[in-house]
């Protein structure tokens, strides 16, 4: 599978621009602010139906315009596939496959497998547990729609339970009947989510470790571990034991919405003890492991986006990454970089067909 062509209309800084791509390596080079990352984000839209960078979709519309359109032509298993994503101010975003509108964006998830590696991935280290849970969920959801639907339902029931706890506090009442129903629903949904996350990480962590050791040339050891309250106790028991605490807080304090991943180097938090190069290597290994996991599970090579990833990496680590993507295990690769000569030197090392777009 590969992206043959993309057309952008009023998307971020592009008014009306098209790119025709090589099936292996495509590079966007130029100064900061010319739109390199915007092209990668447009490609990301075609896979996920949303931006990787902007939570507000309307911010992706070009200034002084009222809509954007991203139109992509793919070759997938020797069939031509057209994916179109568009948004008009004040209206719902539209996602189409071959002219047919998706009723639910979740039905499209996984059809165009894709992995992005970007400087914003540093949020996985810097930010709170929600960011790391989203990473787990995004990987599993690409491959398991049932998991995604369970996750959506869990969040809905969780919101209802939290609203009930607030209602109890405001009205100074308490009754267990409705709460017990929500507890049972959360338990069933939460246990399923926990089991799938645990199974995913059992498979994922060895792949991650292998990539990190390769990138770092085994210079240091790292640890990636799953942390969940459900490791020691079922969710129903936890909910029942913490009811007084939840009533006081007016929200649900236990459940899979509190799960986390710990990132360590030599058994110390990488956030505090890892250098910039080590942190970047950790995140790249994490995303390459995502690529490998999705490829194995889906049977397709995901499109891989490298957004300005070579800064703060020494030459040895860059060469290791290039060597890894320079084999048949990887498919189409998109690279953005501010240094055109560095980019050309890197892609020449691969001996693959490539195209460089100077923006």
Curated annotation (Swiss-Prot):
ATP binds at residues 30-37. One of its GO terms (molecular function) is ATP binding. The keyword Repeat does not apply. PROSITE patterns: RECF_1. Belongs to the RecF family. PANTHER family: DNA REPLICATION AND REPAIR PROTEIN RECF. This is DNA replication and repair protein RecF. It comes from Flavobacterium psychrophilum (strain ATCC 49511 / DSM 21280 / CIP 103535 / JIP02/86).
